[in-house]
C-alpha cells in the first residue's frame, strides 16, 4: 500500500502539513471472506512547524506503522501549544503533541476540559539558555550582570526562577529582554543580548546555521542544572480516549516503533522528514535530530524504565519548580495530568 502525503495551507499564517495515510481495506490472507475492519481516522496536531524532532511521527506514517495498527492519521499544525490543546479539548483534534507543562497551565483553569497526557516523548524538557562565549558566558553563573533574551510566549522561562535559585543566581542580577520569536537568533548573533532562552535543539542549531561559530556557542541545558521538567507529550481528547481506547494504544505503539527507527538510523529518518518540510537542510535537521535523541529522548531514565511514562516523584518535584513562577490554583499531581493506562508494558517500551 502506498503512503501519500498531502500538503495544504491553513487559513492562518501558519502552514499546515497534512500527513494522510491512504489505506485500502482488503481480505485477511488465509481467512475466507473475512474483511479487515475499517481503519480508525485520527486527527493529530503538532504545536509547531514540522522539523526533524518530529521524526517518530513521520516515520510512523512513511514506514507504514500507523497503517499496521489500522489507523488513518491526518496531521495538522497548530499556531502554538495553546491552540493545539484547545483543538484537543474541543474535539477538533483527537491527539496532539504539546509541552506537558503547558498542559498543566491549561488544566489549572476552573473550566478546563479534563485533557490528559498519555505518552511522554521528551523525557527531559529541551529548555536551555544559549549564549556566546565571546560575550563572557560559559557557565550558568556567568549570567549575573548579563542580559538574557526571552521570546514572547516562550514558556520555558517559567522554570528560570527555580533554576536560578537552585544554582545560587540572584534573579535581579540578570536583566530579561523580551522580543518576538522571529528575532531571537538575530539578537544573539548581532550581540544585542548576551544569551537567549529557548529550546536547545532549535535555537542552538539555528544559530550554527546562521553562521555563528560552533565553538563560540554555549548551550546551558536546564536539565543539566537541576531542572526536573518533562517535555513534549501526547495528549488525547477525553471522549476519543473513552470511545476508542484501542486506537489510542495503537497510535502509541506506532510512535514507539517510529522512535526506535529514528534512533537506529537518524540519517535515514531525516531523509523521510525532509520530504515533508519547507526549506529544511539535511545537515541542520540531522544535527537537530541527533541532539534531541541524545539530550531529550534517550535518557538514562528511559534506558532503565522505557519510553513514554513518568515518575510521579519526579513529576511532583517538577511541579514545585514550576510553582516558583506559576501560581497554581491547586498544584497538580501526576494522575491529574497523566494517564498511563494506554501505555504498553514497560518491557515493550524499552529503547537502548
What residue spans do the PLM features occupy?
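N-terminal secretory signal peptides that target proteins for export/translocation
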Residues: 1-12
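Bacterial N-terminal signal peptides
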Residues: 13-28
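Signal peptide processing junction and immediate N-terminal pro/mature segment
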Residues: 27-36
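Short, glycine-/small- and polar/acidic-enriched structural segments
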Residues: 35-190, 194-201, 220-222, 227
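A bilobed periplasmic-binding-protein/Venus flytrap-type ligand-binding module shared by bacterial periplasmic
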Residues: 59, 127-137, 229-247, 303
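Sec-exported extracytoplasmic/periplasmic mature domains
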Residues: 62, 89-90, 108-111, 165-169, ...
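Secondary-structure end/capping motifs
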Residues: 243-325
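Conserved C-terminal helix/tail region of periplasmic/extracytoplasmic solute-binding proteins
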Residues: 315-352
Amino acid at each position: 500500500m502506498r503512503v501519500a502525503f498531502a500538503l495544504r495551507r491553513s487559513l492562518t499564517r501558519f502552514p499546515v502539513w497534512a500527513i494522510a495515510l491512504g489505506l485500502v481495506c482488503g481480505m485477511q490472507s488465509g481467512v475466507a471472506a473475512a474483511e479487515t475492519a475499517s481503519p480508525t481516522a485520527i486527527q493529530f496536531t503538532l504545536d509547531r512547524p514540522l522539523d526533524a524532532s518530529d521524526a517518530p511521527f513521520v516515520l510512523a506514517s512513511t514506514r507504514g506503522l500507523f497503517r499496521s495498527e489500522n489507523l488513518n492519521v491526518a496531521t495538522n499544525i497548530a499556531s502554538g501549544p495553546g491552540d493545539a490543546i484547545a483543538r484537543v479539548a474541543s474535539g477538533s483534534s483527537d491527539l496532539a503533541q504539546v509541552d506537558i507543562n503547558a498542559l498543566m497551565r491549561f488544566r489549572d483553569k476552573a473550566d478546563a476540559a479534563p485533557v490528559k497526557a498519555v505518552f511522554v516523548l521528551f523525557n527531559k524538557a529541551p529548555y536551555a539558555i544559549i549564549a556566546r562565549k565571546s560575550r563572557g558566558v560559559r557557565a550558568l553563573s556567568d549570567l549575573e550582570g548579563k542580559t538574557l533574551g526571552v521570546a514572547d510566549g516562550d514558556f520555558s522561562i517559567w522554570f528560570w526562577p527555580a533554576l536560578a535559585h537552585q544554582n545560587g543566581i540572584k534573579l535581579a542580577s540578570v536583566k530579561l529582554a523580551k522580543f518576538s520569536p522571529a528575532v531571537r537568533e538575530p539578537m544573539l548573533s548581532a550581540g544585542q543580548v548576551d544569551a537567549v532562552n529557548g529550546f536547545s535543539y532549535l535555537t542552538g542549531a539555528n544559530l550554527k546555521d546562521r553562521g555563528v561559530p560552533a565553538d563560540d556557542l554555549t548551550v546551558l541545558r536546564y536539565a543539566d542544572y537541576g531542572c526536573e521538567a518533562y517535555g513534549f507529550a501526547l495528549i488525547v481528547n477525553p471522549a476519543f480516549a473513552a470511545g476508542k481506547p484501542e486506537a489510542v494504544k495503537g497510535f502509541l505503539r506506532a510512535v514507539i516503533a517510529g522512535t526506535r527507527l529514528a534512533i537506529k538510523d537518524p540519517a535515514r529518518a531525516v531523509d523521510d522528514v525532509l520530504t515533508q518540510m519547507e526549506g529544511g537542510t539535511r545537515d541542520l535537521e540531522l544535527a537537530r535530530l541527533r541532539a534531541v535523541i541524545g539530550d531529550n529522548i534517550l535518557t538514562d531514565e528511559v534506558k532503565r524504565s522505557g519510553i513514554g511514562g513518568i515518575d510521579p516523584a519526579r513529576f511532583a518535584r517538577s511541579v514545585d519548580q514550576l510553582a516558583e513562577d506559576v501560581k497554581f490554583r491547586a498544584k497538580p499531581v501526576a494522575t491529574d495530568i497523566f494517564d498511563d493506562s494506554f501505555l504498553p508494558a514497560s518491557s515493550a517500551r524499552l529503547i537502548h
